[in-house]
């Protein structure tokens, strides 16, 4: 176990709660100490949800430690069942309940005797999986539970829908731009003449889950949530699964062609080539923009990418393949699925990083000095310290990346949003230099601290004055080169003379 003050993917119970609270009329009960119950605040603040977060904490306190938990947990489940009348109550274990070795399965069986709704124990091992894996497992567990229940009662619908239809699997609360992506995917499916059979878990009722096998295919837009459910439906009912992420012009077209292949194999007769062509040329501005002089100015510029598998892989491909930007390294914090990530991005970047250590990522950014960073909220903090612009492309994110306006990342409108994000993330030409020449609130003192908190060097007054004269868009690079030169030569104080010597040494 490792003590961390920053985690890219949260603990397992957060994933379970994200899935449970995405469904309509499902209540979650978390068996945890106070301190693990921050999910309620996080959901209402970040997602700006209007409804009350349906999560109750069954607090592990000194009385529980003395007498055991059964009485308290069972009482909480039956009380919430009577008060809220949920269709399903999910009991979520936590690290604490695992340490105490509580028999939660027994608690659920006991509570089920009195509860009118269904009660389910989330089957996740807190010490083996993180938020993303737990969310995937919980969604699969809930879907399987209700399909098996319908099968036992003989209520499972026969056959497929009359028209081609799709289940969109993996849209959840607190997901990165999930609601906007869902709207865009529905619009895309309508354009293709495909009905949406279900969207899960966001906004779905557990009673609708028995209808999932009626769809012609399942679309899983995010690799982190939904693959287990889709493979279960494929194994049980033969429903094909499409897991191509429709992000960027090339991948969106590839996804649509795969949809065409899948539904034509089931008796449809569609050809989407004309639609793809029209969208690429006229609706999405990304293809046109990539040929414009603005985009050509970005050709060869250095960038780094870090995030979850889905977004980091997609952005790496878009930057390299569609916009001609040099991706120095691409990374992911999804260590459990590292092989897939390597396979996807290795030909589009110089180096692949697989790590959950934000310090390692910060140092890697400082080492390569990119023109722009594309990452999570943490990489934005790193970018601010190093004075490198950052576009946020993946969770974890703060409230400003839950936009109120329509900003999908998927589909053809998503390509426009991503293109804007990429272009606006790079510092334009002489912008910094001009601001410094003409003054204004944007002028700023030189920040002499690097990514590492401890620094063995100090700048003298004349050294700083000389550094201030250097244009802003190259100042950071000059500063880092000078500090490297000073360390190599054993200087402790950097004066103007040391700066001149460093410039001569690198031929500047």
Curated annotation (Swiss-Prot):
Its cofactor is [4Fe-4S] cluster. It catalyses: chlorophyllide a + oxidized 2[4Fe-4S]-[ferredoxin] + 2 ADP + 2 phosphate = protochlorophyllide a + reduced 2[4Fe-4S]-[ferredoxin] + 2 ATP + 2 H2O. Coiled coil: none annotated. [4Fe-4S] cluster binds at residue 36. Binds 1 [4Fe-4S] cluster per heterodimer. The cluster is bound at the heterodimer interface by residues from both subunits. Belongs to the ChlB/BchB/BchZ family. This is Light-independent protochlorophyllide reductase subunit B.
């Amino acid at each position: 176990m490792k003590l961390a003050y920053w985690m890219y993917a949260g603990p397992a119970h957060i994933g379970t709660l994200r899935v449970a609270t995405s469904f309509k009329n499902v209540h979650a009960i978390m068996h945890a100490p106070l301190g693990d119950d921050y999910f309620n605040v996080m959901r209402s603040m970040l997602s700006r949800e209007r409804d009350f977060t349906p999560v109750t904490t069954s607090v592990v306190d000194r009385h529980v430690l003395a007498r055991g938990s059964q009485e308290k947990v069972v009482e909480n489940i039956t009380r919430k069942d009577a008060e809220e009348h949920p269709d399903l109550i999910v009991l979520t274990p936590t690290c604490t309940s695992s340490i105490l070795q509580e028999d939660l399965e027994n608690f659920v069986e006991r509570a089920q005797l009195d509860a009118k709704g269904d009660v389910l124990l989330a089957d996740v091992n807190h010490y083996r999986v993180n938020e993303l894996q737990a969310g995937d497992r919980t969604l699969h567990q809930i879907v399987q539970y209700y399909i098996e229940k319908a099968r036992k009662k003989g209520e499972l619908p026969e056959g497929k829908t009359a028209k081609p239809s799709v289940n969109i699997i993996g849209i959840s609360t607190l997901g990165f731009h999930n609601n906007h992506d869902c709207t865009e995917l529905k619009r895309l499916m309508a354009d293709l003449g495909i009905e949406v059979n279900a969207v899960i878990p966001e906004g779905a009722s557990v009673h609708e889950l028995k209808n999932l096998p009626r769809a012609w295919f399942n679309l899983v837009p995010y690799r982190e949530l939904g693959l287990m459910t889709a493979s279960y439906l494929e194994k049980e009912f033969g429903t094909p699964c499409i897991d191509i992420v429709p992000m960027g012009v090339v991948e969106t077209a590839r996804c649509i062609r795969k949809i065409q292949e899948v539904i034509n194999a089931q008796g449809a007769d569609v050809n989407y080539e004309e639609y793809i062509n029209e969208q690429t040329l006229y609706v999405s501005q990304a293809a046109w923009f990539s040929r414009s002089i603005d985009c050509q100015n970005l050709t060869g510029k250095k960038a780094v990418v870090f995030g979850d598998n889905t977004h980091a892989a997609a952005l790496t491909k878009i930057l390299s393949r569609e916009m001609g930007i040099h991706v120095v390294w691409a990374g992911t914090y999804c260590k459990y699925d590292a092989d897939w990530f390597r396979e996807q991005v290795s030909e589009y970047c110089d180096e692949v990083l697989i790590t959950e250590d934000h310090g390692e990522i910060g140092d890697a950014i400082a080492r390569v000095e990119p023109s722009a960073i594309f990452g999570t909220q943490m990489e934005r903090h790193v970018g601010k310290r190093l004075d490198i612009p950052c576009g946020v492309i993946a969770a974890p994110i703060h409230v400003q990346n839950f936009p109120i306006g329509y900003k999908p990342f998927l589909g053809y409108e998503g390509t426009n949003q991503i293109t804007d994000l990429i272009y606006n993330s790079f510092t334009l030409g002489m912008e910094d230099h001009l601001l410094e020449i003409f003054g204004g609130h944007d002028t700023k003192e030189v920040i002499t601290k690097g990514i590492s908190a401890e620094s063995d060097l100090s700048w003298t007054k004349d050294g700083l004055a000389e550094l201030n004269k250097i244009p802003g868009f190259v100042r950071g690079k000059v500063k880092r080169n000078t500090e490297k030169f000073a360390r190599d030569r054993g200087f402790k104080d950097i004066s103007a003379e040391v700066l001149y010597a460093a410039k001569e040494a690198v031929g500047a």
